Amino acid sequence: MSRRRSVSSQENDERLLEAALAEIVEVGVDRLGMSGVARRAGLTTGALYGRYENVNELAAAVWTARVRDAHFQFLDRVIHALVDGDPSASLAGIARELSSPSAVTIAALELLAMARRIDELEEVVTPDVESWLTRWRVGPRVRDRRRRAQALFALGAVWGVILHAMPKARPVEWEPMFARTTRSFAQPYDEPGDRFVAEAAGAVRANVGDASQNALIDSVSAIAARVGFDRATASRIARRANLTSGAIYARYETKSELLSQAVEVLLAQRLADDLVANTYLFTAPDVGRATASVIGGYLSAPRRDWRIFRVEAQLAARHHAELAATLDRVQEAAIRAYLEALGANSAEEHRALDALARFAQAIPLGLAFVDLVAPAVSTTDWRAVFVPLLAPEPF
């Protein structure tokens, strides 16, 4: 027979969970420590170890007791509003959460992303996500493939907007973009008779003119994609590049400087190359179909490590000022280039199209995040989303 726990013991349970949630938001899952949580809660580490064997078990408890239900309720509202067009699910409320995400939302993205590489988290997060996807008919075996594509896109939109703003938040009017998305989802759509073909896409590799530097940058990408930025040690990066740790410090004063350059080189290079390669989309006879093919290529297997690298970079930017500054600079430069490609030359035109440019950058980022947590995303026929979304709106 189990002993009844005292009221003070139960109150300490709550204090520790609240403290752990706050620590995850402040320092991230990778730097979550028992001593930091205990200090924040005003308790001893013994109080923590009496409840949780290790910090990963604590993170799993935060997901189950503090984050899961609240975040899934938010995602419920997203599907109701964007996919089902339910007027009771306020787009304005969703836009407010995206502009100023709650602690629970920030922690949810951290925990969802880390579950793929932390066993204790994976054991609770993966079944919970699968259950939610099944409940909303978003699993890989559903018959309504258009609805599944719409739901995955909706998830990518909200997660992408949040991730994109992590280096530096800026005021953006998101509600019109989501209203346009909802209207497009309600448009009639005839499923094409031909098979969806994703655009061919290769792996992203550094090309800075120095073989050793290229090797180091590519090694950062591979290691960070596997273990995250905080756990990407200099020795491991050097070993994968077939170099010594001294080769890193001969070129960079700190490991952080190397990580930031890797982000700048690989992300700026990819965004610039993609803009040049995809400029034809602005005048394509069927822009929706062409865009769907590009997105399919972006979500293909050769780009997977690079996609994970970018997601890890966005999350780490919340805790690393140098990385945040680099990411923000790269993203803003890409947005300016995109606006110029659209023909926006004046400051007024830039302001008018700013939300569109940010949405266009946030969507692929968000879909990369969806691909981390949902099965069979790469098999999605994205024409079901982009053909109606990019078609001229009926008057």
Can you say where each PLM-predicted feature lies in the sequence?
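Hydrophobic alpha-helical connector segments
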Residues: F72-T105, D274-R307
